[in-house]
Amino acid sequence: MKRIAFTAIFTSALVAFFPEFARAQVAEASAATAAPLSAARLAGQGVLRFLGFEIYRARLWVQPGFDADNYAAHPLALELTYHRDFAAEAIAKRSIEEMRRVGRFTPQQATRWQQALAAALPDVKAGDRLLGLYQPGAGAVFKMGGRVVGEVSDAEFSRLFFGIWLSPQTSEPGLRQELIAATRTAGQGQQ
């Protein structure tokens, strides 16, 4: 209880004596909750767990008219907040494995895509927030901390990559349902 009181008093003092601190806190909170696409809304969120351990929290942002059954026809943003540290190479390798569940591609494509994804992504630490942006017929753009950290300019890669979370063939159907929850309740998609 004393710790809570001290924290409240300390924060109040910072705000009173350093108003720019308050503005920075509000700006940071606004940036963290702002929609990453124009006119987008949060469709759903969920946590990926493996053997009971939280791996990341996923949040899906979509525009009006999004149809989960035809996700690849719509712009979207997928935000992952990691609960563990991962090397970019490990993320890329696992992504290719998961993409194989979604669709077919050649070994040459797998090699090219894994290399491109490993180069596009940063290593992540617990607490890092990575945002993937999808535009139909285009590649994937990845942002961290509000800046572009990489991209993979291949439309087929992008469709399969976001299919890891959104395709009916995903290895995590429960997480998919959580991500598209608001699109179902809004009557914009059925799966």
Describe the residue ranges of each PLM region.
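Bacterial N-terminal signal peptides
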Residues: T7-F17
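Sec/Tat signal peptide C-region and signal peptidase I cleavage site
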Residues: F18-A24
